[in-house]
């Protein structure tokens, strides 16, 4: 049964503008707003963020904070102040040795930065929870099959990761992705999120943590290997409350969407979490608007607890807006109102 419907939102500037947008969200059946808080917002607009959270609460919306694009470790088009200020503490290519424009989340420098970012916002804003938005290693970006191929390069091969690997396994970190490297990357990738989630729950036990991972096959022949594709390891983390999988393009086969959705629910149930599936509410739109209702029904029938869409108004006015952004927004809203049984 779907009991929460979410939309992401970038407008963290003025409370009076956000208030009107929040009312529009409610009119579209939204029960929870995910505030995409950037590093720039944190440094520049922070005095207004608690007021915006308060206004959303006043209007009856739940609020999650998404550290959007933070360190370029999370999904998002935003630039990163951490990377601007740190020429080190970056992910490094295993094949070329190049430093990349992605923070290495295994370094203490980034882990401290990220934890301070989140704990500060939790103290000042009193949100209902936090949303870990597509965390990932920079590489591989292509399909990683058991035969190698386009995804042979991977991260992170920085001095911190290499030392930590050698300290744990007792031999130097290889430059190709062995089973030890895979396990090391999965395990280390969870540390920054687990530690920060634990700190947030120590601050307020009622804070809810949603971890949203890439919607990938992760089977015997094909796996993504970007750090969070081992869904069992993510699902069993004791500090996560909601297991979420990200957007699937409308142009992909319905069976693929169904498979991702059913596996999402299965992992969530296995580890006693709530399940969440995302709809593509920006950039692309279905050829047939009835597909939105069909995919929403697939999620409902599979037992999904929550639906979410990126982003408010279909990305209207941005370079990633859908061709008919407002129509997409309205269609998602119609389906939210149709299926959501709030607090059921």
Q: Across the structure, where does each feature detected by a protein language model lie?
A:
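Substrate-binding cleft/loops of secretory-pathway carbohydrate-active enzymes
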Residues: 140, 193-196, 203-255, 284-298
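Active-site-adjacent "subsite" loops/lids of carbohydrate-active enzymes
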Residues: 64-125, 165, 175-179, 290-292
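Catalytic domains of carbohydrate-active enzymes, especially glycoside hydrolases
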Residues: 15-42, 124-127, 236-243, 298-307
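Substrate-binding cleft of secreted/luminal carbohydrate-active enzymes
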Residues: 245-252, 276-343
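Aromatic- and acidic-residue-enriched segments that line the glycan-binding/catalytic groove
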Residues: 72-97, 133-172, 222
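The substrate-binding groove and active-site-proximal loops of carbohydrate-active enzymes
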Residues: 5-13, 34-43, 96-115, 174-190, ...
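Aromatic-lined substrate-binding rim segments of carbohydrate-active enzymes
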Residues: 21-22, 35-85, 184-203
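Aromatic-lined carbohydrate-recognition surfaces of secreted/lumenal glycan-active proteins
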Residues: 6-10, 64-68, 131-135, 179-227, ...
